[in-house]
Amino acid sequence: ALEAAKEADPKEACGLLLLVKGKKKYWPCKNIAKYPEQMFQICPIDYARAEERGEILAIVHSHPVSAPEPSEADKVAASKGKVPWYIVNPRMEKWSTYNPSGVYISPLLSRQWVWAVQDCWTLARDWYKQEGLELRDWDRPDDPEQFINAPMFDGAYEATGFRLLRDEKLMKGDLLLMSIGSPGLNHCAVYLGDGNVLHHLQNRLSCRDCYGDWLQSSTGKKLRHENSKAIWGTG
């Protein structure tokens, strides 16, 4: 695994630790992340082949530049599984292990953007969860460019419990669907009240932002959840 990480440098290497016929074996996988120098995404075909060969004991990946400690995005992704993560810095030749223990939620502000792990919908779901509202997650395509070209929000918001607002005044907890460099509505933001929103643009840190002219002109739909009255007193 260390040699694979050195060969991949400056990109992140990734793979799996397998138990095959009673022996541990490292199974290298292709990193299909759009920005492999900053993150990793295991090729699903490689993952499936690994499952056929043996039992998956751990996820392995490298941090070519930073210390081999789990990032916030690593902790979130690891919490979705049940196996430890081994992280190596190939230049320092140092390792760390992260054992997930239940669901991990990063701080809402200043999150690193990682597709399907820490993106605009993840941020919205985590905010609603802190407010006492559990929203379902949706499977995204492997490549965020596919989502930009064919966004899913328009066909999913009703099944998630939201209704379209017509002329109602925006209230805390409303969800805004926006078009950011896309032919459709590919971005979402939570309205916090007082002219502010919480959102996470691609390749930026999550932030509290002013709902100014640019974001307003990008907004295509304004939504309100069916349980908003019970939680925030609006409906």
Question: Which residues are covered by each model-predicted region?
Answer:
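Conserved beta-strand-loop surface patch within small alpha/beta domains used
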Residues: 1-58, 64-103
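Generic beta-sheet signal
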Residues: 86-88, 200, 225
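Second-shell loop/turn segments in exported
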Residues: 108-114
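Active-site nucleophilic cysteine motif
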Residues: 114-131
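Surface-exposed patches in mature extracellular/periplasmic domains of secreted proteins
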Residues: 135-140
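...with weaker cross-activation on analogous glycine-rich loops/strands in unrelated enzymes
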Residues: 141-212
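Glycine- and charge-enriched low-complexity intrinsically disordered segments
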Residues: 209-235
